[in-house]
Amino acid sequence: MAAAALLAAVDRNQLRRVPILLLQPREWAWKLRTMKYGTTPGGSITKVLIANRGEIACRVIRTAKKMGVQSVAVYSEADRNSMHVDMADEAYSIGPAPSQQSYLAMEKIIQVAKSSAAQAIHPGYGFLSENMEFAELCKQEGIIFIGPPSSAIRDMGIKSTSKSIMAAAGVPVVEGYHGKDQSDQCLREHAGKIGYPVMIKAVRGGGGKGMRIVRSEREFQEQLESARREAKKSFNDDAMLIEKFVDTPRHVEVQVFGDHHGNAVYLFERDCSVQRRHQKIIEEAPAPGINPEVRRKLGEAAVRAAKAVKYVGAGTVEFIMDSRHNFYFMEMNTRLQVEHPVTEMITGTDLVEWQLRIAAGEKIPLSQEEIPLQGHAFEARIYAEDPDNNFMPGAGPLVHLSTPSADMSTRIETGVRQGDEVSVHYDPMIAKLVVWASDRQSALSKLRYCLHQYNIVGLRSNVDFLLRLSGHPEFEAGNVHTDFIPQHHKDLLPSHSTIAKESVCQAALGLILKEKEMTSAFKLHTQDQFSPFSFSSGRRLNISYTRNMTLRSGKSDIVIAVTYNRDGSYDMQIDNKSFRVLGDLSSEDGCTYLKSSINGVARKSKFILLDNTVHLFSMEGSIEVGIPVPKYLSPVSAEGAQGGTIAPMTGTIEKVFVKAGDRVKAGDSLMVMIAMKMEHTIKAPKDGRIKKVFFSEGAQANRHAPLVEFEEEESDK
């Protein structure tokens, strides 16, 4: 009996230490209530295979360990040394880095499940989690698929079908075209009838893939083709639907659970309105400003949606909501969501444990009336991306990674450690920072406090952007909607952020003290007592020494006149402002800290020097100050080569629109690159004629590689 096996496993392991990342906000006794219902016959689950990678694989493995269920990981060649491989009881290689040859290879995963004797497969999210064929294949092979039946995945995965089912179930839907005629002309005609702006959406899938907003007929064709390519790449299906685009809506979703006995409940709503590239970046539960009556109606509509397709397991019903709190069905995600931890935090539940128990044949652990809603939770997604460059995803090693401490109201969901690499082949998410407090304002304060403690060096991240976002007055007021980032672009992404002179003094002080440390180390180990490198500080008895230092903020050089004083302090002058500076470096927990006093104001910052850049992290924020490198030592400029275009990141050339000899205008599309599962269009930087195209379709281009070269313009005579 599946449920009995699971309960016995829990009993055997009840004295194990619960991983701190999964400790609940309060010591609720919900686990005792999960055992009130009788068990039902089913297949025994003693071992589960996780058909995924990264943080969600780690998340499932932790709960499996807590329940005494053995875990089996799968990994691609790129993930051989990854965190989820180390955490699992067993791990199996399933192929090369590209997901089509590994994490999307159904037959390989089924074969691993058989050879490892895993009775169940947890698909996580993404990859095969909403693949009807995979769910059906598991059933045929006698393997429990931890998710809904394939019929529910089919009905909810095809958006046109799901809209019809929802309308029949009495769930409000948005006006649109969901027909079988997929010709460009038909879609264009319906877009015109609906009225611009419209949303082009992939019939299958989700996560912002294959989705485009079209504001005029002139741009319809290009956006349609782009959405088709991305949908084909992500879901192997380029069918599209057209919907009326609701300006400044809220994205509100409801967590639901169903079981094999016909029961269904909702675990309240989440607000996921704040997005970039149609992907969520910060989520919260419950949704701000929603009164109990609207909350009940949302939940009941979501349960009707789940029951309409005989839903089993974890699912999310997504709605768009207007300013008057009218809501309309958007789609149903037939899997566990990325943002599920905020629901766990406000309800005191472990949704992965619910998934495993329900898959084993148990009833839903709690009735609707027993599910509590207490406090407020936020989740911030920390990505390897450059917000100042249109959120361009990045890849590379996490040279330095330090995080806030996990406690009963703070969770860090991650699949990487310091020294690991964010791969170009997969989603660039580094971690999810999840916090809980008794009310929204307290939770928001805790989120900002923890973000200040999330320090990353080695690649660009969005941590500073998340700090600006969470500190914006309109966000604090709960006035969120899907256009929040574009509407507040100037506040969230300032074009010129000036570094305070005090921060420049901190960087200069850190470099001087680091120089002294290196000099002392040299003197300690050198055999040449008369080496000039033994005397580099410039300090002499009864003499003040002055030197000029040049640091760089962005593209601007900053000259600091530094005077070494006899008492060990420094006088620094930047422009016409003077500072008295003193301090020291110390080491704590493997990190270097700079303690400084600048004009009598004490500061403490984490100090990291990497690749001619000083990184300072403190509770006031983070800054980067560059150390200029002579031009003859500099690499090729990232602005371009030979007046052409360069690859903004490492990726695959998906489409090439031009050839040598073509004339183009500034803004014309030259190529399409695929990286981090996202499509990026390379535009012409100027008018001109193409001299050379360096890559063909399907080729791999490294970051900063020249893509297209323009002919030299003839000078005016």
UniProtKB/Swiss-Prot annotation:
**Binding residues annotated for ATP, in chain numbering:** 159, 201, 207-208, 251, 278, 318
Class in the EC hierarchy, top level: ligase
Looking up InterPro entries in the UniProt record yields: ATP-grasp, BC-like_N, Biotin_BS, Biotin_carboxylase_complex, Biotin_carboxylation_dom, Biotin_COase_C, Biotin_lipoyl, CbamoylP_synth_lsu-like_ATP-bd
| Biotinyl-binding domain boundaries | 622-711
A Pfam family matched by this chain, by name? Biotin_lipoyl
Name a biological process GO annotation.
Answer: L-leucine catabolic process
Report the domain of life of the source organism. Answer: Eukaryota
- Please name the catalytic residues of this protein: 335
Cofactor names:
biotin
This entry carries the following GO cellular component terms, namely: methylcrotonoyl-CoA carboxylase complex; mitochondrial inner membrane; mitochondrial matrix; mitochondrion
Question: Which Gene3D superfamilies does UniProt cross-reference here?
Answer: 2.40.50.100, 3.30.700.40, ATP-grasp fold, B domain
- Known catalysed reaction(s)? 3-methylbut-2-enoyl-CoA + hydrogencarbonate + ATP = 3-methyl-(2E)-glutaconyl-CoA + ADP + phosphate + H(+)
Q: Where would I find the ATP-grasp domain in this sequence?
A: 163-360
Which parts of the sequence belong to the Biotin carboxylation domain? 45-490
Molecular-function annotations in GO: ATP binding; metal ion binding; methylcrotonoyl-CoA carboxylase activity
The record's SUPFAM superfamilies line, in alphabetical order, gives:
Glutathione synthetase ATP-binding domain-like (SSF56059), PreATP-grasp domain (SSF52440), Rudiment single hybrid motif (SSF51246), Single hybrid motif (SSF51230)
The stretch annotated as transit peptide is 1-38
Question: What does the UniProt function comment say about this protein?
Answer: Biotin-attachment subunit of the 3-methylcrotonyl-CoA carboxylase, an enzyme that catalyzes the conversion of 3-methylcrotonyl-CoA to 3-methylglutaconyl-CoA, a critical step for leucine and isovaleric acid catabolism.
| Subunit architecture | Probably a dodecamer composed of six biotin-containing alpha subunits (MCCC1) and six beta (MCCC2) subunits. Interacts (via the biotin carboxylation domain) with SIRT4.
- Which PANTHER family does the annotation name? CARBOXYLASE:PYRUVATE/ACETYL-COA/PROPIONYL-COA CARBOXYLASE, METHYLCROTONOYL-COA CARBOXYLASE SUBUNIT ALPHA, MITOCHONDRIAL-RELATED
Entry protein name: Methylcrotonoyl-CoA carboxylase subunit alpha, mitochondrial
The coding gene here is: Mccc1
